[in-house]
Regions:
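Short helix-capping segments at alpha-helix termini
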Residues: 25-32, 83-85
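A short beta-strand-loop structural module common to alpha/beta enzyme folds
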Residues: 32-42
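N-terminal beta1-alpha1 ligand-phosphate binding loop
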Residues: 2-29
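Hydrophobic residues within alpha-helices
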Residues: 18-26, 111, 174, 178
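Conserved alpha-helical elements of sugar-nucleotide-dependent glycosyltransferases
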Residues: 14-18, 107, 170
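Short hydrophobic segments within beta-strands
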Residues: 7-9, 37, 94
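Glycine-rich phosphate/pyrophosphate-binding loop and the adjoining helix
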Residues: 126-194
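Helix-loop-strand module that forms the ligand-binding subsite of alpha/beta enzymes
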Residues: 41-137
Length: 194
């Protein structure tokens, strides 16, 4: 069974809620195990990431970048980087901010650069914005129009689960896409070694 880690930091519950929704999407695809891992819990043992075939990073966007706890975990992987021990793993990213734009793109680019330096393979978000097909904006998948990763918006001081239905739909579809991509990658690798 292939394993996916969703590693994240969530200060107010919003990023954790999206992480769980991504995990729900992954679980709709057979043959995968998903673990939700908090960044702070991995600081002392980043080598735990070696047990996974795919890594999905999540963070709120704070002042145009990842949160300090996720950045601390990224920095703690220096020993893994020196030996390129994460090379070839599938990777993706997601972020949440209080505004529709909120400079989330720079957060995803930080995650992307981190994964590229480790030699991982990045999975974007291929979901077309559904509002262009007549779906009401708040119900539309990928309503924020992000292709480099998953973006979601939660109003300031809202409960952790308070997202537009479209953002929840996007998280489920993003998880499914990542899961199918991982299975295709491993099926191709199995054929090469047959």
């Amino acid at each position: 069974m292939h394993r996916i880690a969703i590693l994240y930091h969530s200060a107010h519950g919003h990023t954790e809620h999206i992480a769980r929704c991504i995990g729900d999407g992954i679980q709709q695809v057979a043959g995968l195990q998903t673990d939700l891992l908090q960044a702070l819990d991995l600081l002392a043992r980043p080598e735990d990431l070696l047990a996974y075939d795919g890594l999905i990073l999540g963070s709120p966007t704070y002042l145009g970048g990842v949160s300090a706890p996720l950045k601390a975990l990224m920095d703690a992987t220096g020993g893994l980087w020196r030996q390129q021990r994460l090379r070839g793993k599938l990777a993706a990213g997601f972020t949440v901010s209080a505004l529709p734009a909120g400079d989330k793109q720079s957060t995803l680019l930080s995650m992307f650069t981190f994964c590229m330096q480790h030699g991982m393979l990045w999975v974007g978000n291929p979901i077309l914005p559904e509002q262009h097909q007549g779906v009401p904006y708040d119900e539309a998948a990928n309503r924020l129009g992000s292709w480099s990763g998953l973006m979601a918006q939660a109003d300031k001081a809202s409960p952790g689960h308070a997202f537009a239905p479209g953002d929840i739909k996007t998280a489920h579809l993003f998880g499914q896409h990542f899961a199918h991509t991982l299975l295709r990658l491993h099926a191709g690798a199995s054929l090469e070694h047959a």
